[in-house]
Amino acid sequence: MLRPPFALGVLFLLAMLPLASSVQVDAQNDEPAWRSVGLDPDLWTDRPVINESRTQMMVSYQGNAVIELNVSYQPGLVDERVEGTVVIELFENWAPITTNNMINHVESGLYDGVFFHRVVDNFVTQAGDPTCKTVGIYPAANPSCGSGGTGETIPLEHNDNLSHVDGAMGMARGAEEDSGDSQWYITDTEQHGLDPENRDDGGYAVFGIVRDGMTFVREIAS
């Protein structure tokens, strides 16, 4: 488990807002209220740097769920606490199993108060372990932090439109391909070595991307 030398924790709360046109739309009667909230993608300016060859991931798709990741961290022992929001679009259109898993965990409150337990500069920041919560004073945490989950796994899901571009959200897993649970990560710079075509172990599944707040991701990673 890797942590930056002076990081004092990253706590977050996720809430969902559906991607739509700039006008609000009505939700279906059997859908949660957040499905009726419209967003304007033009307001998102702090984006990842994405190669033009991956234009399909640069486009926002109407109807996809969007996560607001509220982060709070202290870069150094003498620095003031930084608070911000990272906006992430979930590609429900291309990764329905993985995004549905994420949405269910968000709605259940599984991630509330969890911190990033693995931080590697110029690679990934990883979170999603429900046991990774502060016990007493940070960085004191549950001894199982980093290896926890819900115990319910999902199959490895790939789509040709998705790859590990800068700011991609991917599903963490164990040695077995179909062992994804609740842990996920965000890439800090392109990490195509995690894509299935570049590995002999099945690779890792991408299911979302940062749309705003990438500066916070980079600060946490560094």
Language-model segments: residues:
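Cyclophilin-like peptidyl-prolyl cis-trans isomerases
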Residues: 22-222
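Secretory targeting signatures
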Residues: 1-26
